[in-house]
A protein has these predicted regions:
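Outer-membrane beta-barrel "beta-signal"
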Residues: 499-511
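Transmembrane beta-barrel strands of outer-membrane/channel proteins
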Residues: 59-67, 101-107, 159-165, 200-206, ...
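N-terminal, post-signal peptide beta-strand-biased segments of exported outer-membrane/organellar beta-barrel
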Residues: 26-111, 124
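Long, internal scaffold/assembly segments composed of regular secondary structure
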Residues: 236-372
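Outer-membrane beta-barrel translocator domains and adjoining extracellular loop/strand segments
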Residues: 71-77, 111-118, 168-176, 211-217, ...
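Outer-membrane beta-barrel channels and translocator barrels
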Residues: 93-97, 150-154, 192-194, 270-272, ...
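Outer-membrane beta-barrel transmembrane strands
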Residues: 78-84, 135-152, 160, 178, ...
Length: 511
């Protein structure tokens, strides 16, 4: 992060911590911040005006550190990684207004890393890879805040803003620095009368990331990079080549950005809640006249929830559905240099990729006074098609699924023991075709097959896992927590290991 941005984030942190400290002068309660969030479905919606549907105020602050290790990992993940961070969050309800806010910082360091050069691999429909294992450092700052205000009997307004800034650095050739910024704002309103409440909100978002690569050390030959244009088909060449766009004259690195504009509608009747959110997205790779790719798309999210309260326990049922569709257009650009001045001439674009992503996640929770239990499942379908060179067309259908169950028990009012188990699996199918038999001799598109096979094995391998955590409340809201997780994959041929382990320690204060 640039020094100016870091100074601003430190100021925001001081302001937020002071706010939470002032708000925290209340009596302690058995219910934690996460449990208060769960009570009100509006807390997880895109309309912050609904947070006043509940009246409990809770806050917490936590310092944590963790370690991950093992060879059962995605192609871009670290074999070993450390992390440390701090987070504070609060919900506060006053007479006519409520506030919700959070701040977090995380320092993460991974070893033996290569592959995707982005901070969130897979988010964008195009990717860029490098192949020299080395250490990466990632810093992430996140700040969000919102309010809900009673403007008149039965009417509420609110607004929420989320801000995340991240910077990543790899200090071994091929070196690269990343700067990422995510911003989301959602103003909204709500009408409520008796057991009925309805609301609507506008949602605007922007995400932007720039990858800047460089080679510092001396080598007999330059390092190679790969530009993935879809399904791991693309361009493999020296990183300074024009095909991977990491070192283009007139462009600062490889910039990617995406905007989203949409709306969300919410409705609640007694314990039943529903939300529909739609967004139109527009993304690009490049800047100024050098726009190499554009990727417009659509996104729909549906969130359903039901809460039933009994005499001694509460039942929560949730169902989340997501759909995302994107198309990728590659621009046909020509550079024309005259009298030392270079201009870029555009000759249209070709659609080289389409992808559609579906997700479904049902969850049930049983919450009693001294123990809880849950069961959930997650299903994801990824359907993609790539056509970079006419007349070749490649299609893929990828499915991933997992089921998870677990519970938590409180002992003597100060100790919480939690455990869960998980089972996952997946499948992938592909088909290659030609849309025309008489298109003439054309060289088939290049695929980074070894890396593709490695990632598909990780995505589709059968796996089992388990997690265990212990939390101890030792003094007036202060607590310590230790957690561990283990994951094991079956029938592996390409991955370097069959196990992945995680450990975490935390100390915090809830008020």
């Amino acid at each position: 992060m640039k020094p100016k941005d870091s100074l601003c984030m430190n100021r925001y942190m001081c302001i937020l911590v002071a706010f939470l400290t002032l708000c925290g002068q209340t009596a302690l309660s058995a219910q934690t911040y996460e449990q208060v969030l769960r009570r009100n479905f509006w807390n997880g919606s895109s309309n912050v005006a609904g947070i006043r549907q509940d009246s409990l105020s809770r806050s917490y602050a936590e310092l944590s550190g963790g370690y991950d290790t093992g060879g059962f990992k995605a192609s871009w993940q670290a074999e070993d990684a450390w992390n440390a961070g701090a987070r504070t969050a609060s919900i506060r309800h006053l007479e006519r207004i409520s506030f919700k806010g959070a701040f977090s910082f995380r320092q993460w360091e991974g070893y033996g890393m290569c592959g995707s050069m982005f901070t969130d691999p897979g988010y964008y429909p195009v990717d860029v890879l490098e192949f020299t294992p080395g250490r990466k450092t990632l810093q992430t700052y996140a700040l969000d805040g919102g309010f809900s205000y009673d403007v008149a009997p039965g009417w509420r307004i609110g607004a929420m803003a989320d801000f995340t800034s991240a910077n990543m650095a790899k200090r071994k050739d091929l070196r690269h620095d990343n700067w990422k910024l995510d911003f989301r704002i959602a103003p909204g309103f709500m009408f409520h009368k008796g057991d009925l409440a309805v609301g609507a909100s506008y949602v605007f978002g922007k995400t932007a990331e720039t990858v800047k690569a460089e080679q510092v050390g001396t080598a007999e030959s330059s390092y190679y990079a790969f530009l993935d244009k879809g399904l791991m088909y693309g361009v493999y060449q020296v990183w300074t080549g024009s095909g991977v766009h990491l070192d283009e004259d007139g462009v600062n690195g490889l910039p990617v950005k995406e905007f989203s504009n949409g709306f969300a509608l919410q409705a609640q009747y007694k314990g039943l809640f529903a939300e529909l959110e739609y967004a139109r997205t527009s993304g690009s790779v490049g800047e100024k006249e050098y726009i190499w790719f554009r990727f417009p798309g659509d996104r729909v999210d549906v969130r359903l929830g039901y809460k039933a309260a009994g005499r001694t326990a509460e039942h929560y049922a949730r169902l989340d559905f997501g759909w995302k569709s994107q198309a990728v257009f590659e621009s046909v650009l020509e550079k024309d240099t005259e009298n030392g001045v270079t201009t870029v001439i555009g000759h249209g674009s070709n659609m080289i990729q389409r992808r559609e992503i579906l997700s479904l996640r049902p969850k049930y929770e049983y919450v009693a006074e001294s123990w809880e239990a849950f069961a959930e499942a997650g299903f994801g379908w990824h359907n993609g098609a790539a056509s970079q060179i006419y007349p070749y067309v490649q299609t893929q259908s990828l499915m991933k699924a997992e089921v998870r169950a677990g519970g938590m028990v409180r002992l003597a009012g100060v100790v919480e023991l939690a455990a869960d188990v998980v089972y996952g699996w997946g499948s992938v199918s592909e088909e290659d075709s030609q849309v025309a038999e008489d298109a003439g001799a054309q060289l088939a598109p290049y695929r980074l097959q070894e890396w593709y096979d490695l990632q598909m094995e990780y995505d589709t391998a059968r796996r089992i896992g388990a997690g265990l955590s212990v939390k101890y409340d030792f003094w007036k809201g202060m607590y310590v927590k230790a957690a561990g997780r283990w994951l094991h994959g079956f029938d592996l041929r390409k991955l370097t290991g069959a196990d992945r382990m995680e450990a975490k320690l935390a100390i915090g204060y809830q008020f």
